[in-house]
């Protein structure tokens, strides 16, 4: 569990990276099967098909992964209180892997978790070609657990939750790609490509047939 994930990736490829994520409590079970949580966190990782050097493209992939794992949280009836990202750099980039996390109020909201992942990435990423990437939501609690803030509108929060539940139901019936953001058409997006893959490469995609 204490091994450097970048070294594991170089030595063992995708399997090495998966071993690191599983050692840290990350489960990448396929979402088309009913999920029963067995670990302290849910996550998604992938080795990119090429070096990603543009910040907006790296962020795009992270946000796609955050959405996929948020769906899994709701399916498991859990909320996360810890958001973490992992970036493994290219062999051409002499940088150690970037690992960053932050505590948050309990959430299973796609919109909220995407914002947390985006903020964490923008705060910590300082450049460099990225070749492997991961998102993890840890320290899970039951979805019934609520924390209310004076700065939040409960009505809007409830409407957002209902919207995401409706989207989940549509994807359960017609597949993950039934509802997608226009950003999947942008260069660097991985959602469509990964929808046809199996195993660890497609871990985290919901309802892929």
Predicted feature locations:
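Acidic, metal-coordinating catalytic segment for phosphate/diphosphate chemistry
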Residues: 103-209
């Amino acid at each position: 569990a204490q091994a450097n994930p970048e070294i594991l990736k170089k030595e063992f490829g995708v399997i090495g990276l998966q071993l690191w994520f599983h050692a840290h409590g990350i489960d990448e079970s396929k979402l088309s099967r009913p999920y029963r949580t067995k670990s302290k966190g849910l996550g998604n990782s992938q080795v990119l098909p090429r070096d990603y050097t543009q910040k907006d493209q790296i962020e795009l992939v992270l946000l796609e992964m955050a959405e996929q794992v948020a769906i899994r949280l709701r399916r498991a009836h859990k909320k996360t209180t810890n958001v973490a990202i992992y970036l493994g750099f290219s062999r051409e980039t002499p940088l150690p892997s970037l690992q960053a996390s932050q505590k948050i109020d309990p959430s299973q909201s796609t919109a909220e978790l995407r914002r947390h992942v985006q903020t964490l990435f923008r705060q910590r990423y300082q450049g460099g070609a990225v070749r492997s990437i991961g998102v993890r939501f840890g320290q899970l609690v039951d979805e019934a657990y609520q924390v209310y803030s004076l700065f939040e509108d409960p009505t809007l929060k409830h409407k957002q939750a209902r919207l995401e539940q409706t989207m989940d139901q549509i994807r359960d019936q017609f597949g993950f790609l039934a509802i997608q953001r226009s950003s999947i058409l942008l260069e660097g997006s991985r959602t469509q490509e990964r929808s046809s893959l199996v195993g660890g490469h497609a871990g985290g995609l919901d309802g892929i047939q």
